[in-house]
Amino acid sequence: MDRFELIETIKCRGAVIFGTGFAAGMFMQILKERKLDGRVRYFMETAKSRETFYDLPVYSLDEAPLEQGGDPPLICAAVHDAIAGQIMPVLEKRYGSRAVWVYPMLSRLAFGDTIYTGDISVRDVIAAQPAENRWITVRYAALCGYRAAKDRGEVVSAYLKASAGDPDIGRRIYIKTQSRFSRPRTAEERLKRLWRISDDIASCGWKADPVLLDTDMRVIDGLHRLALAVYFGIGSINCELAKPSALYDSLFTGKNRITPAAQTDAGLTEKEIVFLDSMRSCLATRAEEGRKEHEKR
């Protein structure tokens, strides 16, 4: 099912959304923009964690109402790919072809088809990000912390110096900040996936899907890929560009972008905030080094 068929099916049959994290909220915002939020009947989770989400009831998988008669609604799994492998077999066993994984469609649903594809300097993408945002820095720091036990060199040394004897600080900040808009379990799985990908790159070389930006250089999808590209000294990265959308700021709030206010809300200590500031400088420096290395080739 592609995104066009998905929307038409929801218009006709309605939807139940599985998930109550960032992806589910993003999907609901997209449906609201299309005036289809009224077609959503309720939300589901594996184990119920709240009573309502977007003013609709939340049920556990075992407590969800049985649909009777007519065309039952789609079961739209709005979950990150880090946990989709665990979730989708359960939904498909219970709901068959009604279960659809919508996460891969979200960016295209929100921003439409891309208007450009090509390589863009990683340094330029990093430099274009607002100074207050720490969402790439947080991923980069967590990656450096993991690689510190495996690699040597200036990148790891800079991380260890910034960590001031606390090598776990990058992982800890990642979980704290990501858990503000995703389930802690999802945050943990996403981080483990980032680490696994870094191991693959270290063993087999660079390979990654394109990063999705808008023409204002705002990141839509690919924050982990950018962090990986900076760490491994990749000078330019394949990118797809979409037209800017008014949805951007409502989809990617301060919590997602990890602004100063979001850092405080996530419970970061003064030490952790100072560390992030230091790592932002390390990120910019390493991105510039990657550009220079690329130009020499």
Residue ranges and their predicted role:
Residues 245-295:
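Amphipathic, charge-rich alpha-helical segments that serve as recognition/docking helices
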Residues 237-240:
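Short hydrophobic alpha-helical runs that function as membrane-insertion/retention elements
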Residues 73-76, 201, 222, 229:
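A residue-level signal for conserved active-site and pocket-lining positions in enzyme catalytic cores
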Residues 215-233:
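A sequence-level detector for short glycine-anchored, His/Arg-bearing signature motifs
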Residues 165-220:
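Short alpha-helix boundary/capping and kink motifs at helix termini
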Residues 1-108:
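Hydrophobic, well-ordered beta-alpha structural blocks that scaffold small-molecule cofactor pockets
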Residues 79, 97-189, 280, 284-288, ...:
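An acidic, glycine-rich, mixed-charge low-complexity segment common to nucleic-acid enzymes
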Residues 54-59, 113-118, 251-259:
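Short, surface-exposed amphipathic charged segments that create phosphate/polyanion-binding patches used
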